[in-house]
């Protein structure tokens, strides 16, 4: 059972993000798409029609000013006769060119284009007419070649843990009893801000036929500031600097092959020697009237554990550690086929120097906790994690069935615990009423096999590995079922839901974290309304 009744975590954060990009490139003429050509022809016809209507209206006003009766039929007949003499696109030959001085007559003049026969003349006129028409349906397109980019990001965080009536001996250690609250009350505060500047130069993909991929080079500078409590009730300040450089190679255009690779290396500061390489590639193959996508993802990360694994000060927790860099490698493959609504994903992770929190405590005869302590840990050996996931959806008329099944295996469950199997399924009917009212009626279920799930530390606001040995608690092997109804019309959605409808069934082991039970059966009703013009 949860023994803390009056404790809160408060998180305040503010964020500023600014980026600006300057492009260098050129303009070129490209043919409009079929849709754009149709739209322009419609606009040209509309413009001509409007001009004719305006001219008629002007003639009507002029006749009225002169005290005459406007004869619309005569006007239309006059306009038809005015424009019937020459078809659209007809050309006037112009003045006869002078003869070549050596030519005896026009037929031998080398300065004129020789047109032999009526068919050739018609063909030449047709080509000229088509070229004139085609020139109307080209547009100017700006093609950026090189981009100069600067991005700055600033994040500010403050966390407060506040508690009252903490049970005696609940925590194993006490490092100070000073500050805003003392005795059985706690007021711990940490502060952190982070500013990152990134400068990049990018050669953009596709600006000519030889530029098959985009290329980017960048440099980043990080400044991180932390404030932790001291035993005297003040704050101790820490500053960290990091300079890194990297590059990116990507291809996103085209239908068959796409890829993206990014590498970044830390040069100076706390992240000196870090390395991050990320890449993905996908191949899209026409198959059975649809597209079969085969995608591969991989990364290699050698990174410094975050500041709070290395340094943390609080009234009941205190550490300053020198930790090794974590090395994390992943290889993942994904197979997607929209026609059958199938997605299969398989991933293998290997982690060395994995860093995590472990929480331990003693249990009294009354079932209460004493001697609680949270400790940062680092597993020097390697950990392997295998993940296989299948997403399979079905649809038959108004009936829909969505499924996701995941298998996982960790080589060290005591350090990186995962359920062997978890599933999500959602069965519902979807239909329309009077063509405007969208209705969903259904039920969903979540389930995972039992395992020693991560514990929760309210003092840290973090999940931790259970560190109580034989007293570790297993949760799971219990389905959570919800039933619901959604009604959607235009910008408004109404819903009703009965969550955890199966509460009280089976062994009642409905926990997502040890000692933190879920709510029992709850009925919810609500409305979602989008306000926009």
Segments the model singles out, each with a brief description of its role:
Residues 47-123:
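Long intrinsically disordered, low-complexity regions that are acidic and Ser/Thr-rich
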Residues 1-2:
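Periplasmic-side early beta-strands and strand-to-turn transitions of outer-membrane beta-barrels
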Residues 6-50, 54, 69, 101, ...:
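Exposed, low-structure sequence patches enriched in small/polar residues
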């Amino acid at each position: 059972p949860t023994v803390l009744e009056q404790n809160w975590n408060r998180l305040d954060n503010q964020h500023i993000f600014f980026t600006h990009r300057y492009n260098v490139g050129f303009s070129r003429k490209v043919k409009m798409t079929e849709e754009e050509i149709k739209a322009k022809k419609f606009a040209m016809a509309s413009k001509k029609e409007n001009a004719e209507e305006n001219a008629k209206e002007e003639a009507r006003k002029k006749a009225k000013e002169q005290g005459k009766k406007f004869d619309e039929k005569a006007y239309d007949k006059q306009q038809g006769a005015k424009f019937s003499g020459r078809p659209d696109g007809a050309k006037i030959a112009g003045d006869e060119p002078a003869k070549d001085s050596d030519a005896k007559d026009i037929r031998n003049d080398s300065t004129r284009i020789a047109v032999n026969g009526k068919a050739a003349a018609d063909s030449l006129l047709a080509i000229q007419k088509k070229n004139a028409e085609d020139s109307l349906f080209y547009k100017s397109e700006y093609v950026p070649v090189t981009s100069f980019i600067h991005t700055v990001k600033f994040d500010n965080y403050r966390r407060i843990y506040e508690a009252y009536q903490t049970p005696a001996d609940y925590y194993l250690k006490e490092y100070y009893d000073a500050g805003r609250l003392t005795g059985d009350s706690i007021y711990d505060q940490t502060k952190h801000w982070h500013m990152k500047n990134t400068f990049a130069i990018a050669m953009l993909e596709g600006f000519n036929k030889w530029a098959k991929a985009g290329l980017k080079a960048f440099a980043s500078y990080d400044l991180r500031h932390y404030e932790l409590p001291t035993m005297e009730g003040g704050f101790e300040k820490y500053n960290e600097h990091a300079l890194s450089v990297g590059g990116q190679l990507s291809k996103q255009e085209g239908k068959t092959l796409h890829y993206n690779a990014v590498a970044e290396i830390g040069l100076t500061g706390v992240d000196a020697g870090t390395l991050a390489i990320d890449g993905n590639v996908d191949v899209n193959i026409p198959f059975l009237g649809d597209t079969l996508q085969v995608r591969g993802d991989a990364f290699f990360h050698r990174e410094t554990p975050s500041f709070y694994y290395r340094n943390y000060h609080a009234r009941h927790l205190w550490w300053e550690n020198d930790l090794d860099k974590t090395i994390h490698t992943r290889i993942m493959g994904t197979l997607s086929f929209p026609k059958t609504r199938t997605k299969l994903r398989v991933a293998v992770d290997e982690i060395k120097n994995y860093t995590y929190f472990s929480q331990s405590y003693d249990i009294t005869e009354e079932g209460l906790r004493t001697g609680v302590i949270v400790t940062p840990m680092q597993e020097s050996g390697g950990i392997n994690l295998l993940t296989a996931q299948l997403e399979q959806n079905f649809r038959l008329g108004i009936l829909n069935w969505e499924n996701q099944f995941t298998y996982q295996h960790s080589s060290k469950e005591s350090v990186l615990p995962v359920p062997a199997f978890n599933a999500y399924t959602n069965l519902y009917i979807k239909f329309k009423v009077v063509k405007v009212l969208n209705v969903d009626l259904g039920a969903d279920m979540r389930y995972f096999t039992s395992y020693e799930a991560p514990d929760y530390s309210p003092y840290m606001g973090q999940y931790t590995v259970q560190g109580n040995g034989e007293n570790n608690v297993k949760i799971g092997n219990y389905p959570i079922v919800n039933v619901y109804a959604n009604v959607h019309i235009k910008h408004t959605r109404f819903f009703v839901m009965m969550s955890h409808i199966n509460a009280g069934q089976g062994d009642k082991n409905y926990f997502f974290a040890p000692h933190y039970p879920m709510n029992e059966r709850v009925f919810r009703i609500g409305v979602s309304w989008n306000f926009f013009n």
